[in-house]
Amino acid sequence: MTRHFLRDDDLSPTEQADILALAADLKKAPFSRRPLAGPRGVAVIFDKNSTRTRFSFDIGIAQLGGHAVVVDGLSTQLGRDETLQDTARVLSGYVDAIVWRTFGQHRLDAMAATATVPVVNALSDEFHPCQVLADLQTIAERKGSLNGLRLSYFGDGANNMAHSLMLGAVTAGVHVTVATPVGFTPDPSVLAAAKKRAEATGASVTVTVDADTAAAGADVLVTDTWTSMGQENDGLDRVKPFWPFQVNARLVGLADSEAIVLHCLPAHRGDEITNEVMDGPTSAIWDEAENRLHAQKALLVWLLER
């Protein structure tokens, strides 16, 4: 059966751990696995702008022996009303995997329903699961075992990073706290799914409007832009309510003395995170960005070699 990676809880705890272990191996030996040798092709489609996702998938696919066919959605029939089901059937005859960065999650679900090759969510409005694999790899590098750690996220609790962190981190046994302003809490269905997964792994999920409480004793502090792509004109005030959730030196000082800070990038320096923290000793942001390459390669190997 073809496996897809559309949201973080598509992986069981054991499957996630296997991928993270493989990511660590591939970081040490980048050319040790070549499931795409030939080269075999991977469709990499972008409906949204990208820097890290584009470079990391393109380079990673090459390191796996393959060829990335990178296009923007508007340059294909995806932008001219061809059904996603028809596109999935056609692409499945050309390539060995489909990597897609798009808008609504329902588009990925529709593509995966018909595709006979793996479909990978490279970011949607609702989830960013490839980023969270890289985040977990980075945390494991700095902290060792993930199980039992405390991760606190600060910012828009309804955005794709908050959703994926809840699902992905609790899968690894990490306790997650989402600190967010009133009116920006996570989607109830995602929160329920995260709590259900947490029950199975011994983790927990908490949502709070108190940033200081969330930071106290945390092992990992994570933030993201206050305005995600496509939200620029949604009519909501995405500045004033978020100032108490800025990741700054004072907030970091409330966390564990060996805490690390993550940000998926791009960052709006001086808004959700200060220069002092981003460039300071607690920052693991640059390792996190690099690990997109290794984590995504591991995911592709896992999907393709099944």
UniProtKB/Swiss-Prot annotation:
Question: Which Gene Ontology CC terms are recorded?
Answer: cytoplasm
Single GO MF annotation: ornithine carbamoyltransferase activity
Pathway it works in: Amino-acid biosynthesis; L-arginine biosynthesis; L-arginine from L-ornithine and carbamoyl phosphate: step 1/3
Q: What EC number(s) are associated with this protein in UniProt?
A: 2.1.3.3
Main localization, broad class: cytoplasm
Sorted UniProt keywords: Amino-acid biosynthesis, Arginine biosynthesis, Cytoplasm, Transferase
Give its localization.
Answer: Cytoplasm
Q: What are the recorded Gene Ontology BP terms?
A: arginine biosynthetic process via ornithine; citrulline biosynthetic process; L-arginine biosynthetic process
Looking up PROSITE patterns in the UniProt record yields: CARBAMOYLTRANSFERASE
What Pfam families does the database record attribute to this sequence?
A: OTCace, OTCace_N
InterPro entries assigned to the protein according to its UniProt record, in alphabetical order: Asp/Orn_carbamoyltranf_P-bd (IPR006132), Asp/Orn_carbamoylTrfase (IPR006130), Asp/Orn_carbamoylTrfase_sf (IPR036901), Asp_carbamoyltransf_Asp/Orn-bd (IPR006131), Orn/put_carbamltrans (IPR002292), OTCase_ArgI (IPR024904)
User: Can you state which reaction this protein catalyses?
Assistant: carbamoyl phosphate + L-ornithine = L-citrulline + phosphate + H(+)
Q: Which residues bind L-ornithine?
A: 160, 224, 228-229
Record: residues binding carbamoyl phosphate:
50-53, 77, 101, 128-131, 264-265, 292
Role played: Reversibly catalyzes the transfer of the carbamoyl group from carbamoyl phosphate (CP) to the N(epsilon) atom of ornithine (ORN) to produce L-citrulline.
The family assignment reads: Belongs to the aspartate/ornithine carbamoyltransferase superfamily. OTCase family.
Question: What name does this protein carry?
Answer: Ornithine carbamoyltransferase
